[in-house]
Amino acid sequence: TLFTSFAEKMGYAKLLKIVKTYRNSQEVIDIAGNFIQKNSKQITKRLISPKKINDPVVIYTYDSTYKGKNGNRKSGSNYAIAYAVQTAIEQLLEYKKNENISPGTILLLGRFGFDGDRLERTGLFEYSHRGSKIRCVKYPNLDITYMTAHSSKGLGYDDVIIINGKNETYGFPSKVEDDPVLAFVIKGDRSIDYAEERRLFYVAMTRTKNRVFMIAPE
């Protein structure tokens, strides 16, 4: 890209790296950093943070074959995901209780806008407008927002729950192919599988000020 090869394309350039961060804990940025730096085309940079935290990333799994009461696998899987999200919220609250701090703000992150709609259809969450507040029926007083990973860029929340970590076309990473027309205006990064999805997952992980909870199939 122009940014990673700026000096080569434009002549003299001096690279100044911002390496200190105060949003994320060192543990979170180490995990996210190791993940994104597997791409050899990335500019190498290791961030440093004064914040420390135990259990920076917590993974919750669900049964993707669950069919629910009506025997429908799709709606059953949606319910299993929503229930796993609710369980993650309960664990988050337990962490806060043990640390003697308030729950703060919670961000639910999906890969697509309809991930939030699917949560609502289960009856465990209420969600009326995309990119806005989402209500956990069991814990109605919590400050929870739903967004896509793309729309969350630049924002920060106390804790983040990534809800769509499944190996499917509309999962995270997404396997949806770009429109071929885009190839004429955007040079795709083929240096590593799912290069753009890796960058987007890094964005998702680093929206948190504390912990990241990930929801994925067993």
Task: Please annotate each region the language model reported.
Residues 102-105, 150-206, 210-217:
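Conserved helicase C-terminal RecA-like lobe
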Residues 24-25, 77, 81, 115, ...:
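Helical mechanochemical/support elements of P-loop NTPase systems and associated helical scaffolds
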Residues 7-10, 52, 99, 139, ...:
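Conserved catalytic network of the ASCE P-loop NTPase/AAA+ motor domain
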Residues 64-155:
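Conserved helicase/translocase motor-coupling segment
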Residues 1, 21-26, 64-66, 113-115, ...:
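Conserved nucleotide-binding/hydrolysis micro-motifs of P-loop NTPases
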Residues 18, 31-32, 85-89, 201:
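Structural preference for long, well-ordered alpha-helical segments in enzyme cores
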Residues 10-15, 54-57, 142-144, 155-159, ...:
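Short glycine-/polar-rich loops that comprise or flank the Walker A/P-loop
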Residues 1-66:
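Conserved RecA-like helicase ATPase core segment
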